[in-house]
Amino acid sequence: RQTELPEIWLSFALKGSGYLSDSLTMDKLGLASVTSQLMNASTLNFSEPAMAAELEKIGSFISFSMAEDATFVTVHSLSKHIDRTLELLQEKLFSPAFKASEFARIRKQYIEVAEAQTREADSIANMVYDRLLYGNKDIRGIPPTVLMQTLPQITLDDVKGYYKTFYSPQDSTLVVVGDIEQEAMLEKLDFLLDWQQTAAAKPMLHAAPEVEQTTLYFAHKAGATQTAIRLGYLTDLPYDLTSTYFKAGLMNFTLGRAFNSRLNLNLREDKGITYGARSRFDSSDLPGPYTVSTAVTAAATGTAIREIMGEITAYAEQGITDAELAFMRSAVAQRDALAYETNQQKLGFLATLEKYQADKDYTVQQQHIINTISKAEINGLARNYLPLDQLNILVVGDRATVWPQLAALGYPLIELTVDGTPVTDAKQRP
């Protein structure tokens, strides 16, 4: 309970209904996303504009959004209007209208987004990089070009079936933060007791392809004045709060997470060939990638890759300096100190506690790790999780400008289409 402000935040996590659930019906990719957005549209008793007006009248907010493994329902209300807000939540959750016109509009929007992702170098880089990481069978490696084919096959009956199967309290969680006693809140939520449970199947995921050696991949984007670069690999680290994943993030802070990181200082401040270069670990319950990302002046593509590999090599082999370690400790501690100020941030904190079954003092444990992690441990993490000989290097840019620079780097070089398949004929290039 938080009494500083007269407001209440709620977050439902409907587990199993995230975009990974599309792996169960690969010919209907996009179904989870379309369903989630339709839940933000009309209900049986309110049109979409009428519902928006009703919520605005009382200063409330209800939104459905989707993540990897769950659909999230986020609710915000002034304390004095919580009863009416929950009535509207009940309407949205249990009485979606699923109007044909709204379904057609939302499906069309997703098709347009998928098409747009094939036109920008940065978007192409993201989708081809995922294909390299996860392969061509796993849903996480499926490009938007496939969505452009599957979205038109989704019907309104598919949406209704998905809603019936996946929008369930089975294994779901609810977190509440705000100016209300727990018992009073539970009484107001008793309408959830009648919610019928259904057991949805687990996502079907596939083993990632092995990376035998560092390889350079190229996808052509005609006329691109900037080159999009992605460099990295799929780690074996699931997300954690106080173990190896957290510590690997501290290790990476100096290399590519801070504004004054080695990568950003080199490519932006020293070479002046980019607006920014970043690197990060990005896992969930499932192990995720370590990625260096940047966009550079096309003429400096080869230079950028040499400098990135040089910085990674130096960090993995020589490690962090005393000054860098001290700065990391100070900067991360200050950043985290401001991470739980608002009720919305506290909502996220509680959701994290639940999702990862974490100790309530995990932030204290994190602070202890930040303050005590040694140079030796940082350097060991750099050696272990910056595998110089097993990286995917992806470049998206104009072939005429970029290809000669790539060929001079000495890595195995493979050209791909914008959906990540090897080019065997020049006609495959856009």
Give the ranges of each region predicted by the language model:
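M16 family metallopeptidases and their MPP-like homologs
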Residues: 5-40, 44-94, 107, 111-115, ...
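An aromatic/glycine/proline-enriched structural segment found at the starts
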Residues: 135-140, 173-238, 340, 395-430
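Conserved, carboxylate-rich catalytic/transport cores that coordinate ions
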Residues: 163
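Short Gly/Pro-enriched turn/cap motifs at secondary-structure boundaries
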Residues: 1, 219-222, 282
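Peptidyl-prolyl cis-trans isomerase
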Residues: 95-99, 103, 154-156
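PPIase-associated folding chaperone regions across multiple families
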Residues: 242-251, 255, 268, 401
